[in-house]
Amino acid sequence: MTLKFGTDGIRGPVDTVVTAEACLRIGQAVGIVAKEEGWNTVMIGKDTRVSGYMLESALQAGFIASGINVRLLGPIPTPGVAYLSKSFRDHFGVVISASHNSFEDNGIKIFMPNGEKLSKEIEKKVEKILNSNLDSVNSVSIGKASRFDESGARYIEFCKATVPPEISFRSLRIVLDCANGACYKVSPAIFRELGAEVITIGDAPMAITLMITVVRHILKLLSRLY
């Protein structure tokens, strides 16, 4: 299958389109272009879909094989990856997520070091390499992988800093539905640290119930709270 970028990265079912093999190739192809652009390190974030762990491993292998260093962020909202990519010199970002698509799908979205989506020009370069024969770098030049455990904390501080000091959350009681998705940790923390009382719904990373079971029970739960 020929892989091509859509309006928001590459998306599709994980058993036919966004497969482990496809992600290995995507990692290699993007890595080759990234090296040409002078981008040396990729930050990989994801949502809570169960397939994300498989695709993360495949992408990681592809990037390392092309000589790119990898920093694994774990589950984090998509804007968090864009922000962190912009915060570090010569870093770019990849998000493993299909956003509002059903949990059977997954996708790959790429951010340039300026925090913006991959340009059309670079997408075309990647597509050309992606659908050709790919070679790995030698053992001396392969990339290295590490986990970046501060990703959530850094993004939380950034979000808090966007709130004007004259706005107070201390008198607010907020019911927050995280839909068991990528924001299940950072969103409650942001509002609590701003002073609000937070009641969470769907704050467990249960990928199969992502955006499905939460909505059914929200009215019943809210009626108990009020």
Regions of interest found by a model, annotated:
Residues M1-S66, F92, A145-I174:
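An N-terminal, well-structured beta->alpha segment
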Residues N106-Y226:
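Gly/Ser/Thr-enriched, mixed-charge loops and adjacent short helices
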Residues G12, V33, N101, G181-C183:
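Short, acidic Gly/Pro/Ser/Thr-rich loop/turn segments
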Residues M1, G6-I10, V14, L72, ...:
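Glycine-rich, flexible loop/turn motifs
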Residues I32, T41-D105, I190-Y226:
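N-terminal small/polar loop signature for handling phosphorylated ligands or for N-terminal nucleophile
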Residues T7-G9, D47, P75, I96-S99, ...:
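Fold-independent oxyanion-binding glycine-rich loops
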Residues V18-L24, S57, P79, K86, ...:
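Generic secondary-structure boundary signal with a strong preference for alpha-helix termini
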